[in-house]
Amino acid sequence: KRYQAFHAEATPELPALLAYTGIVFKRLNPKDFSAEDFGYAQEHLRLTSFCYGLLRPLDVIRAYRLEGDVVLPELGNQTLFSYWRSRLTDTFIEDIRSAGGILCNLASDEMKSLFDWKRVESEVRVVTPEFHVWKNGKLATIVVYTKMSRGEMTRFILKNKIGNPEELKGFSWEGFEFDESLSDEKKLVFINGMGE
């Protein structure tokens, strides 16, 4: 029923950046973006989708619900992960190179599986922000905070037109601050000390 409705004319089409409604996109809050913000996003932001592959923010899509481990019998029983991997990796690498050769990776680990990630990391510079909180005297990753922080950082990048990973260190939100001692050139660690 869901898949039949997907092609129905009544199913609304929206720009990808406005179509998604999860925690990351709520914190990103593109509804208040200016035309300039959308223009910068269109050039510098890419969204990953099990249904559509690699999207630019203004690509028009229909709402859908789909998991990456769906098997495609018509295509030799491969999953969506393997289907997209061979189709997206080259395009993704070229996109990153044409935008300066540096990727700020704010995608979930699951979405990285849409690409040959080892190849991506070997051909372009990948910087991955991590978000941790102190809990019971240890650093912990709390999924909801990670998702919210990814959305907020994406907003920070787009609103401030950030192009240099060094500028990401200035990100601060809800107690999350950059921690130089836990970071390196591949990962930028942000810590919230609320549970110390």
Segments predicted by a language model, with ranges:
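Active-site helix-to-loop segments that bind/position phosphate- or nucleotide-bearing substrates
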Residues: 1-32
